[in-house]
Amino acid sequence: MFSSVNTCWTLVGAFLVYFMQAGFALCEAGFTRAKNTGNILMKNMMDFCIGTPCYWLIGFGLMFGGTGALIGGFDPFIQGDYSHLGLDIPLWVYIVFQTVFCATAATIVSGSMAERTNFKAYCVYSAAISLVVYPICGHWMWGGGWLQSMGFHDFAGSAAVHNVGGVIAMLGAALLGPRIGKYDKDGKPHAIPGHNLTAGALGVFILWFCWFGFNGGSSLSLSTDETMTLTGLVCFNTNLAAAVSTCVTMLFTWKRYGKPDVSMTLNGSLAGLVAITAGCDTVSPFGAFIIGFVAGILVVLSVEFFDNIAKIDDPVGAVSVHFANGVWGTIAVGLFSDGGNGVGKGLFYGGGLSQLGIQLLGLIVVDAYVLAVMFVIFKVIDKTIGLRVPAEVEIDGLDIHEHGLASAYAGFAISDANSAAMVPNENTDLGEDDASKASAKQMDAAVPVVREPAVIHDGIYDTGMHKVSIIAKLSKFDQLKTALNDLGVTGMTVTQVMGCGIQKGTSEKYRGVPVDTTLLPKIKVEVIVSKISVDAVVEAAKKELYTGHIGDGKIFVYNVTRVVKIRTGEEDFAALQDVE
């Protein structure tokens, strides 16, 4: 007889794990460049949609179709008898739960190979992961295979899901090679920041939320006092390890880089979640604290290792999050298990080296199998349809070449720069601003003004109409707009541009690597004035833009010889009046 409580809980867990696809999509899109956003979203959609029928075809049978040491059984389309699993929930509910886990392993690979992988190749190797790679590893650890019979423990997938996905991600990124521009000829890494940390952060929050289904749902039961207590411990340990890991990563990067690194801290959250997944049911909260603490440091050192020493270009840090911390979490069971939930005690709880040895053996064999099989698959793909896109496609962006998508972002929007500057208001304007403290000479140096001569050519003189073109930081737009409106300027043309200056931003770092690009996001504001004094516009702009630092902006003043309003045919001053 089936348990309705357990069935509902397992389905809730499955639905939460499915929603992790949204978290992965946002993380990967945010940590990569805008020109590849559509490709990232497409890959995260398709690995689930390809993996689902593949897992139904033979994957589930290989994983759970029997109790053989190496494989479960060959059961196409899940037609066999699975009573040996001893489930108190319907088989199809269990299949749904396992399917979303399989899809997660395939999704992990997408991030490390982002921005240069052939989309056809991605579809092929995602199918291979769901057909044979993940199911066979899963059988060894969860389906009654030889590792499970030895006592290997991985409650929710540090090894079976994250380590497997992470080791494939590492191999794939290594075989692909780095993105164009990631390393110079001397092997020095260059930071390639993601385009949208907001999306990346939202992805992390979604993943953290869904992890309660990933780990908590793996209990498959809430019908007894014991299983309710176990699920509560699992969820508490999951949250604690993630929170500790996040704090440690923030503090560690603050000490190491001089400032707390945002993207690395976000990865620190995921690192703690991955690391606690194997032992969340069998370690105490103190053990979870230590596991999260180590994960927070490990993810930073791992990113630096793969960037600077191994020269494996991983745009989103997937290898460091899932492989490095999947390994750590699996080993941690052999160190911190207190013997709960029928698991052998770890080294620090009087269990000796027995459980630790089993955990290490499992990792070595699983990773060796995955590396061997995926190496062959990647090489076959590379020799046939090609694993990597041509340089031209990579430079232009995969969106336009692979999907015919000019941009994943329609329309035009003003975005804020990564700046702590506040727009002054009655609550923030507390006194003297930077401009009022500066001398005229300082302001002229910080915000240069270039004026076109009054005589343009062939005796054509100043008409009294001028175009003022202002190049400034994105974060200053609202202040500048308000100041111009106060002068009576009601019409302006605004464009987002990239500025190339002499400053190299040497103090800025991304994942510990100095950002040395000279192209910086700017805003260009153009206004045409006649009755309003040009000097008043210039002085107002200088006052709002001035901070005293390189990059405050520039102002260009041009003579305008003629203006024509298309709607009415009016010219010059009359054309500048916005009336019906």
Show where each model-derived region lies.
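Glycine- and aromatic-enriched membrane alpha-helices
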Residues: 1-457
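Positively charged, small/polar-rich N-terminal and surface patches that mediate targeting and assembly
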Residues: 401-405, 420-580
